[in-house]
């Protein structure tokens, strides 16, 4: 999907024809500038999409979530030897929501008292997932439903659904 989007983005404004070959799971894109053939895979070869069984949910305004990501993501670590620090720690409780990021040189905490949860929960969301989420958040104000369990986080807004695997580590105290 990423290669398809990049190919279409780089084409000039002109008519484009798509030819889908279902037997080989390939797509051919034809335009005045040339022909591009992309191969695909059978959907049954991919793992099943996880479901949010035994999970919890919280609604976060898109502008609040975007601000929280912008204020914390730059301080995450690139050190893969310390995976807990390569994401943003999110802590929800009855009184507030806190986003924390550190690379061991900088420590950023962003707290909101207007977003709460009935029970205390905490998780580490990977930097890459938050970067993607920030890029897809709508510019107009909308509510983002975040559902989560012990291993995954599910973000749902407008017609966008995003699932990410949480980092299964203990965040430094």
Segments (PLM) and residue ranges:
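Structural preference for solvent-exposed beta-strand-turn elements
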Residues: 1-173
């Amino acid at each position: 999907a990423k290669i398809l989007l990049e190919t279409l983005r780089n084409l000039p404004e002109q008519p484009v024809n798509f030819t889908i070959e279902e037997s080989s799971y390939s797509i051919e894109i034809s335009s005045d500038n040339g022909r591009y053939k992309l191969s695909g895979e059978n959907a049954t070869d991919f793992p099943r999409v996880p479901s949010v069984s035994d999970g919890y949910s919280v609604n976060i305004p898109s502008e609040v979530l975007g601000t929280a990501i912008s204020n914390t993501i730059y301080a995450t670590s690139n050190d893969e030897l310390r995976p807990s620090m390569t994401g943003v720690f999110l802590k929800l409780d009855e009184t507030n929501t806190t986003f924390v990021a550190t690379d061991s040189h900088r420590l950023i905490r962003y707290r909101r008292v207007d977003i709460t949860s009935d029970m205390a929960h905490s998780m580490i969301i990977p930097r890459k997932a938050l970067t993607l989420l920030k890029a897809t958040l709508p510019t107009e104000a909308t509510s983002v439903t975040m559902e989560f369990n012990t291993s995954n986080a599910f973000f749902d807004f407008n017609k966008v659904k995003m699932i990410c695997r949480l980092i299964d580590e203990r965040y430094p105290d």
